[in-house]
């Protein structure tokens, strides 16, 4: 992903690319099929998590790490929570409701995240593996 020098621009591009990948590409169709199969097959789930989801998670982290290096994001920001807030609705639309994910939707997700006072900073809350 390109570094646009601005967290908002980077997030809009990342979310737009994710939505297009999941809903408009052959690879996205395979991703959706594997995600479904992973719900029923522990071996597929383990491999899907380690080989596919982990790589996607690193791509999702890129805009935040770039922003942190530029001084646009506080060290205390919970990046994992921010990713969940941003990409969760995209996955939900594609995998659960089968709704389209237009640029206006992904742009609105980025804008809402950026409008949060602490930009996802949640001192003391678990980032993953904790109870929700």
Predicted regions and their residues:
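C-terminal peripheral helix-coil segments that are non-catalytic and often amphipathic
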Residues: 9, 13-14, 54, 61-69, ...
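Amphipathic alpha-helical interaction segments
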Residues: 13, 29-33, 81, 85, ...
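All-alpha amphipathic helical-bundle segments outside canonical DNA-binding/catalytic cores
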Residues: 47-52, 69-84, 103
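Amphipathic alpha-helical packing segments from all-alpha helical-bundle domains
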Residues: 25-29, 43-69
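Hydrophobic alpha-helical connector segments
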Residues: 1-31
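Short helix-capping/turn signature of helix-turn-helix
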Residues: 34-41, 52
């Amino acid at each position: 992903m390109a570094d646009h020098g601005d967290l908002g621009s980077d997030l809009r591009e990342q979310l737009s690319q994710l939505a297009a990948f999941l809903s408009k590409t052959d690879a996205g169709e395979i991703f959706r099929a594997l995600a479904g199969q992973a719900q029923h097959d522990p071996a597929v789930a383990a491999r899907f998590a380690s080989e596919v989801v982990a790589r996607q998670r690193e791509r999702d982290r890129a805009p935040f790490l770039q922003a942190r290096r530029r001084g646009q994001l506080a060290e205390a920001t919970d990046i994992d929570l921010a990713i969940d807030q941003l990409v969760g609705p995209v996955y939900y639309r594609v995998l659960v409701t089968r709704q389209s994910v237009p640029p206006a939707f992904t742009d609105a997700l980025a804008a809402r995240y950026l409008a949060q006072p602490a930009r996802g900073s949640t001192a003391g809350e678990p980032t993953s593996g904790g109870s929700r």
